[in-house]
Amino acid sequence: MSFLYKLRIIFIWPLLVITLLSTPKPVSTETAQLVSSETFVFDQALIMGQGITNDGEYFYTSGTVTGINSTAIAKFRVGSMDFVDSNFNPLPKVCTDRGNNHIGGISYYNGKIYAPVEGGDEVYACIVVFDAETLEATGEVYDLPNNLYPSGVPWCAVDPETGYLYASIWKSTKVIHVYDTNDSMKHIGDINLKTPISHIQGAEFLDGTLYMSQDTRNKGSIRDILKVDFESGEVSVVAERDIVNEDYEAEGMTFTKGDGGAILHVLDYNKLIGINVNSYKADF
């Protein structure tokens, strides 16, 4: 048994036990039936505190701790959440040289992980692409115009049916920008919304529809899952998740499919302890 593994047992497992005993668990609501909740602490929390996506076999997560200038991309097995691999501080030099230090809500498409990246004095919002097998950056870095992303880019989601990538700013906006991943991230249009969205932490497509994880704090411990109708521009709340503790931060989300239907997985961040991966029936 290695020295580092012994340290992990000595320090992490007691922390995990304390967390499990003291942390209130999320509960089901009329619109969000909880299936399971798993807690990850310390080193694993560092690599999964922002975004989550999957390819059916693996979950891919992103982590950012700006206080210690740490970023990460990681891989876990779908079904068991067993750790597979991670890449600490994976951003390419062109990003780190200009101060990029934040990876947001990520999205998987066609063997690649698309990551929204921001940070630095001039924000420098961009999409960085990683190889899903190796977790290494592919060298593809697509800068986004500062006039469209003055406050950065917190999330992106790729429609697996078209290869189009969708993204918006963090603050209140009525526009979602659309890019073609198969054409050098060309900006091909916008989705104009009837009502503004804000504080979107992650998003994913399910059967051609875009769903988003929102972290507004105006409903106590309730965190909303939104649905966007591209044709009408309507934005609606399809699930109200009760994460019990109003100080927790809702982060990224993804869907998996099985014989029993689709399951929604959402990251909820307790910054004092770690990450909860909360899973719900996607009956919407």
Positions of PLM-derived features:
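Beta-strand-rich domains and repeat architectures in extracellular enzymes and scaffolds
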Residues: 41-71, 102
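Short coil/turn segments that connect the beta-strands within blades of beta-propeller domains
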Residues: 56-57, 110-111, 161-163, 207-209, ...
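Blade-loop segments of beta-propeller domains
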Residues: 81-110, 114
